[in-house]
Swiss-Prot record:
It comes from the Bacteria. Residues 7-151 form the N-acetyltransferase domain. NCBIfam families: PRK13688.1. It comes from Bacillus licheniformis (strain ATCC 14580 / DSM 13 / JCM 2505 / CCUG 7422 / NBRC 12200 / NCIMB 9375 / NCTC 10341 / NRRL NRS-1264 / Gibson 46). Its EC number is 2.3.1.-. Keywords: Acyltransferase, Transferase. Signal peptide: none annotated. GO terms for molecular function: acyltransferase activity, transferring groups other than amino-acyl groups. This is Uncharacterized N-acetyltransferase BLi01727/BL05157. CDD domains: NAT_SF. The keyword Acyltransferase applies. The keyword Protein biosynthesis does not apply. It holds the Pfam family Acetyltransf_1.
């Protein structure tokens, strides 16, 4: 049985991330993010993943954003930023991406993401909707948002 788990910030995870870089799009690389967290000795990892056996096959980063800097949801509303969701080739279309997004939704907070690859069908299926583009706010990205009011929360654990 596979499950979503918080990834440790260590050299083993760094090696696993290098495997994604071999297959992935440069924009999805999380290597630099992980290295900076290692340098800062940040024990509260924003990285989550799914292992198939001993191999990391899917991952994402998930950051909680303070409501004071919220430009997408109700004023003062904390929300999650879901970044760099990626599933290795050969493991795609097995529900791993869906598991990661459902895990993020389980926190019961609104979610913002900026998909980088042709994945609009996936995000639509997951209940995400586009926001009205604002050049100053969105800076060339095409953000999508999900509101928890549309689905029941499963957990109150913090990201």
């Amino acid at each position: 049985m596979v499950k979503v788990e918080r990834l440790l910030i260590n050299y083993k995870t760094l090696e696993e991330f290098k495997k994604f870089r071999e297959y992935g799009i440069q924009e999805l690389s999380m290597l630099e993010d992980l290295e900076s967290n290692m340098i800062e000795n940040d024990s509260n990892s924003p990285f989550y993943g799914i292992y198939y056996g001993n191999r990391l096959v899917a991952r994402m980063s998930l950051y909680k954003v303070d409501g004071k800097s919220n430009q997408y949801f109700e004023e003062g509303q904390d929300y999650l930023e879901l970044w760099k969701l990626e599933v290795l080739p050969g493991y795609q279309r097995n529900g791993y991406g869906t598991m990661l997004v459902e895990f993020a939704k389980s926190f019961g907070l609104p979610i913002r993401t900026s998909p980088r690859v042709k994945s609009s069908d996936f995000w639509n299926k997951m209940g995400f909707t586009p926001v009205k583009y604002d050049m100053a706010r969105d800076k060339g990205e095409n953000p999508l948002v999900w509101h928890p009011a549309s689905e029941p929360s499963q957990s109150s654990e913090s990201a």
